[in-house]
Regions:
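Polytopic membrane enzymes that build or remodel cell-surface glycoconjugates and lipids
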Residues: 1-251
Length: 251
């Protein structure tokens, strides 16, 4: 409990430092870190021994992001943090995408707060070592580290494993559950199961699908209007971070 709790507190501190660096304001960063620290949904990561992997991976991802933008003259440090994040939990593989997203929305290259002030090539080139590490990790998981069918957790050809559409509908249903727990965190327990969605004609699937399309639309809208960029940044961060466990492409 001490170890898990300590890393959770450290994650909140790093989140505050990163958001303060991004927004250049103390209050929004503090409030976001406070919600992260105290939200009941974090209970599993703090109280369960097996939840340490989540806290560790978040710690190294946030550390890598902070070092990448705070100390650009030390490019090796965030790379080490990325490797440690991957060794903690493989969902950290999305860190290069989070780096690109942050630089795109807040333009740490020249601090002009403009999406068009630098071309995307200059943003992508520093990320090539991170992408290389991610590709090597995927190769290892597909070969010598393929302990238990890495890219298909279902041994049979069930509906969920064989149909991308059903996985997408189920993802919409899961989004409904996620948003509900974020707003009203009740009946929290381990190993929450969600019924597979066989079609779109279900209230939870429809709500999740509409929420997804609306949020993605708002994120795209924010690209054209800087005053909305914080909303777009948060929405895209949420879906990028969720993508490794969404089961849409890989069941």
């Amino acid at each position: 409990h001490i170890v898990n709790g300590s890393f959770h507190i450290a994650d909140a501190v790093l989140l505050f430092l990163l958001l303060r660096l991004i927004f250049r304001k103390h209050l929004p960063a503090f409030l976001a870190a406070l919600v992260f620290l105290a939200h009941p949904l974090q209970t599993e990561a703090v109280t369960m021994v097996t939840g340490l992997g989540d806290s560790l991976s978040v710690f190294f991802v946030l550390l890598g992001l902070y070092l990448y933008f705070r100390l650009p003259e030390r490019p090796g440090l965030p790379l080490y943090a990325y490797i440690l994040a991957l060794m903690s939990k493989e969902s950290a593989i999305v860190m290069p995408a989070l780096l690109f997203l942050t630089d795109l929305f807040y333009d740490f290259g020249n601090h002009k707060n403009s999406y068009d002030s630098r071309n995307h090539r200059s943003r992508v080139l520093p990320l090539l070592p991170f992408i290389g590490i991610a590709l090597v990790y995927i190769l290892l998981r597909a070969t010598i580290l393929n302990f238990s069918n890495s890219f298909n957790f279902y041994n049979g050809e069930g509906l969920f494993a064989s149909s991308v559409l059903i996985r997408l509908f189920t993802f919409f249903r899961v989004l409904t559950v996620y948003f509900g727990l974020l707003i009203l965190p009740v009946q929290l327990h381990m190993e929450r199961s969600v019924e597979i969605a066989l079609n779109f004609l279900s209230p939870s699937v429809i709500f999740g699908g509409l929420a997804f399309l609306s949020l993605v639309g708002l994120a795209i809208f924010s690209l054209r209007f800087l005053r909305w960029r914080t909303f777009g940044f948060g929405i895209l961060w949420f879906f990028i971070a969720l993508s490794p466990t969404s089961n849409i492409l890989v069941p």
